[in-house]
Amino acid sequence: LHFLLRRQRQMCIRDRDADGRKIPGKVSEDCLFLNIYKPKNAKKLAPVLVWMHGGAFKHGSANEFDGSVLAAQQQVVVVTLNFRVGAFGFLDFSKFGSEYLGSASNGIQDCILALQWIQDNIEEYGGDPDNVTISGESSGGTMTLGLLGCPSAYSLYHKAIACLSLIHISEPTRHTSI
């Protein structure tokens, strides 16, 4: 197995856990990164699994999932990604001016940007850009379902697996184009 991560990156700024305890680990606004795990000695381009972390959209990190075993045993390139959480990822600032329209979708935009990077670069890591599956658990599963509804993401993945996802559908107060 070839593990490409050179060092653990910082997590996105986040809330405390459900019990109000501070979550350990270093945080930063400079937190958008990918971890890439690839099988060793692959003979052809491997399918790509993009994993989005859980954490109630308030905490979580790409570092929480080690894709090395999956990559080695299933001959798949595993990509874990960070996206902004809490207020940095999902707070709506549009009431402060039209320049902030869409601000409540920063976390989704982060995932779309990561998927664009994967499409453009994953072949360099042995991954097949024409065989990308998006997946996640808990809020990562909800993010997976959210990406199914984003026209700008349609060409960036080919399959989706949502694990333990909860989605609440309500009448939106405003429509945001993503």
For each of these PLM feature ranges, what is it?
Residues 7-10, 14-29:
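Aromatic- and Gly/Pro-rich amphipathic surface segment
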